């Protein structure tokens, strides 16, 4: 569950985490910016 973001975290809302080029939406960033889980 993700959407695009910038490296600064811009574009992620309060319950999202910037993970590389994507926002992890209600999930966590794993693999040093590789993927969102779950």
Curated annotation (Swiss-Prot):
It comes from the Eukaryota. It is found in: Secreted. Its main location: secreted. Keywords: Disulfide bond, Ion channel impairing toxin, Neurotoxin, Secreted, Toxin, Voltage-gated sodium channel impairing toxin. Disulfide bonds join 5-19, 12-24, 18-29, 23-36. Transmembrane segments: none annotated. GO terms for cellular component: extracellular region. GO terms for molecular function: sodium channel regulator activity; toxin activity. Expressed by the venom duct. Belongs to the conotoxin I1 superfamily. The cysteine framework is XI (C-C-CC-CC-C-C). Iota-conotoxins bind to voltage-gated sodium channels (Nav) and act as agonists by shifting the voltage-dependence of activation to more hyperpolarized levels. Produces general excitatory symptoms. This is Iota-conotoxin-like L11.5. It comes from Conus lynceus. The lineage of its organism: Eukaryota, Metazoa, Spiralia, Lophotrochozoa, Mollusca.
């Amino acid at each position: 569950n993700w959407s695009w973001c910038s490296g600064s975290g811009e574009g992620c809302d309060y319950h999202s985490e910037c993970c590389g080029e994507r926002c992890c939406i209600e999930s966590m960033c794993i693999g040093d910016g590789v993927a969102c889980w779950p």
